[in-house]
Every structure is written in C-alpha cells, then in structure tokens.
Amino acid sequence: MKAVALALFLAGAANGYTGSAACGQCHQAIAESYKNTAMARSFRAVQPGIRLPEFDGRAFLHQASRQTFTPVTEAGRYLVSRQQSTSGFQPFRMAVDYILGSGDHARSYLHKAPDNALLELPVSWYARRGGYWEMSPGYDRAGHQGFTREVNARCLFCHNAYPQKNKLGEGIDCERCHGPGDQHVKDAKRASIVNPARLPAERSLEVCLQCHLETTSGDLPGSRLRPGRDVFSYRPGEPLGDYQQYLDHAPDAGQGEKFEIVSSAYRMRQAACYRARPEKLGCTACHDVHRQMSRAETVAKTQQVCTSCHAQTQHEPSGDCVNCHMPTRETEDVPHVEMTDHKIGIGLRPFTALVRRDDVPYGGDVVAYYPPGGTVGITTAPPLSPKRKDYTANGQALLRAGKVTAAVAAFRTAVNTRPEVADIRVNLAAALIAQNDYPAAQEQLEEAIRTGPSIEVARGAWLAARKAGAPLPTAREKYDDSLRTQMLSAHSNLGVVLDHMGDHEGAIKEFRRAVECDPSSAAAKQNLRQALTR
C-alpha cells in the first residue's frame, strides 16, 4: 500500500535541481531583492523569531457553525483554538507549523501531523481593512471540514519550490522559473540554464502560466495531468500542454465572466489588448519578477506599456490606466480578497463579486481550454436526485446496529454507484474487517488510496489490513502507531474497531475525541450516543 498523504518527503522531485542557495552565490543582487517578493514569501515554516502579530488572542465567532476561533501565542508557538458554542467539551487546539501565502492579500496556516500530512487550519488572516480573521477559503459554511482538510501536492505546486528528498521548500525559488540548476552551477555556462526572457513568447509566458493560469477552482477538474506526468514534472521551456491539459466550462454555459483568485492569466487572455498582440503583452511586460515593485513603480511601468499602443487617447490621461481599465474587486471563490482584474476593458465592472453557488453542481459540458481544441473525454454528472437512496448512510446505520452482512451489501452498492469516492471504499473496508475478511478489506483500502486525492480516511483504523489476516489486537497496535490525533475520522474509525473488539470503554474514549475534533459532526455524536446507551 503506497503512501498517499501529502508527498511532504518525496524521493526527490526532480534530478538536476540544486536549490536556490547555490544561485545566490553568483547572482547576489537578484537573490537579495527577490527575497522580498510575494513569490519568495509564498510558503515558509514557522521558525523561532518569526513574528505573527495577528495571533493576538482576539476571538472570532463563525455564525454558521456556531464555533469560536481564537488565535493565540503560547510558549513561543502559534495556535488556533476552537470552541463549539453549544458543546460542553474542552476547546480543541492545533499548532501552526507552516504559513501559506505572502500576506500581501492573505495568510493561511498549516499544521504538520505525525504522519507528515499538512492540515489546513479553518481560519485565515486577510490583509484588507488593516487585517482581520475570517474563515479559510471553502470553510464559510456550517458543515466545514474543521481541522481535517489535507493540503495535497497540487495545492503546494503554486506556493513552493519543488520538494527535495526529506526536505520541503520555502517559497517559489529560482528553479521554478529557470529549471534545474545543477548543470549550470557546474558549467557556469549560460546555455545550461533556462532564461525565460530568451524563450519564444509562448514558452516564456507558460513559465508564468504554470501557476497563474486556472480556469476555475470550482466544480470542474480545472486541469488534468498528461498520462505519465506527475505534479512536479513540469520544466520551464517545455510546452505547458505536454505537462497538463487545462479544461473549462463550455462557452454556452454562461461562465465566461467568472473572476477568481487565480484568474489573472485567464482574464488577461480574454482581453482585446492581449489578443491583438500576445507576443508583447505577457506578464513581464508589467511585472518585475525579481523584486517587489512599489505602487508608484507599477503605475509608471503599466502606463508606459499602455501608451506604447494607445498614444492617442479619448480622454485626458490620468497617469494611472490600471485604476479604471483594470480595477480591483473581490474574487468569487475567496470573498475576502481583492485582486486586479486583468481583463483590460472600458467601463466599470462591479467591485463586489456575487457569492458563487458551490452548492449547485455544474452539469454541463467540459471543453479543452489550453491548449485549445481536441477531445477532453470528460463529462460532468448532473445533480443527484434528492430521491436517490443514500447507500453509504444506510450501510453506516446497519454497521452501527451490528448487521454486518447487510452493511457490506449496502456499501458494495454504494461503491458500484460511485467507484471514484475513496470514503465509500473505506466504509466497506470497515464492514469487511467486522466480518474478519481481511484480504477483501485490504483490496478496498488499496483501491481507495489509488482513487482518492486525500487519504486521511484510508489511513485510519484499518491500516493493519495491509497484512491480510492480521488479528484485530494487532490492528489496534498498528493504528495507534499511525494515529493522527487531530482526525475526526481517525478517532471514529478506531472507536469502531475497539467496539467490535469488545473494548467499549476504549470506544467511548475515541468517540469523545472525535466529537471534540468536530462538535458539529452528527455522525460523531451519534457514535458516542449509541456507545453510551449500550
């Protein structure tokens, strides 16, 4: 069974990468100025001496979930505490180990779990209006994921250097744009390193597009890796389409004006100015990637770019073309962040975005966006009928009632209905373990790990099923060794195992911990209630 939690410690993301420290030995001035850019500050570990003044002990109440979050500092560590308003349980707390985001717009916070997985904390700090706390992207709803949301390799791809063996980088580094530098360091020859400025215009732009092109963060697969490619296999200078295919809503879906936090390149490619002269209006026409530009410098540079084509204007130049023709406004997917709209245009557009309806699944066609043309081979499923029988919930109820054979049948039906959902296979594995059918449980777990983008559900109570026929006491020992103490699913799963072993007190203890992890979880409270009433 392969490890699938975030690949924090890869066996080396790429041959030939040497690390940006080697670059700074020769390119000292660039290395020094680059340290202050948002890209360089996009990801970092919490080390002694790092100051996060936003962890000031001021509580933040999230009305939808009735949970109060308090960012605090204790003994040199930064933590977020959560208290359920209607719960008598002790507050649940989690420490901050990594900072995601430069802080120019926002900062999110990650915790490193015992198995090296990175978990996103449910609250983030936003820079607008002097700075304030709000829910992290995707969390502003009653049934949010709490402290269990796992950050995967795709999330980190655009926030960090490529990871090396036993080492996670800190921020976008030189080699993300210039490619592997080992040979260049050895040869000290210009030809042995990629310089995006010397690439053809399309290849040069794609160095930026690898991170700054996203069609949507919503309910589509916004992109798909090409067969045989892994997340960290893109090399600057190669055609981006050889690495992955970008996908989008069909043109007639009415989604063309979406404005999201990573929409800069998507919107720029819609602009008439860009379409007229794409070879001239790339990202670096206005942006200096090696240093943090001041507001005045940015205005002056963009003004120069605009007037190089628009020397004759229909109004008195204001000195700041961007202010009117590329206004900033709230993004649809992260409402607390304002970004510059790169779809250069005439006339004001709304500054406040409509809240995107993530609860309404998209049921239309998916098309190839970049590179354009060709077949996609993807169709989105229409919204499920509310009358559809929920076989998973039925199986869980049957398993709690001790009707193991019926539970196995229900979960198998659910798997046949939704084979791509890893959680259902883990539920089936639980029922198979209750039947002492360890080989079948192992098979389901391995398939769950292959199909699931996150394996928090597959690394819990049934880790011992990797060895077919292992007795349950051994399963408990193995699970205790790998237990991720913050996981709702981990405590719930261990509670189920202990309950089947006859250790009811141990099961109650784990069910209590599950409720403390997420007091809003109806399933966790149901498990505890049933265990207490036996």
Task: Enumerate the language-model features and the residues they cover.
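Residue-level recognition of tetratricopeptide repeat
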Residues: 387, 421, 454-455, 487, ...
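Primarily the internal scaffold of c-type cytochrome electron-transfer domains
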Residues: 21, 29-102, 108-113, 122, ...
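Structural marker of alpha-solenoid helical repeat scaffolds
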Residues: 417, 451, 482-485, 517
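Register position in tetratricopeptide repeats
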Residues: 400, 434, 467-468, 500, ...
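Conserved alpha-helical positions within TPR/SEL1-like repeat arrays
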Residues: 392-396, 423-433, 459-463, 488-496, ...
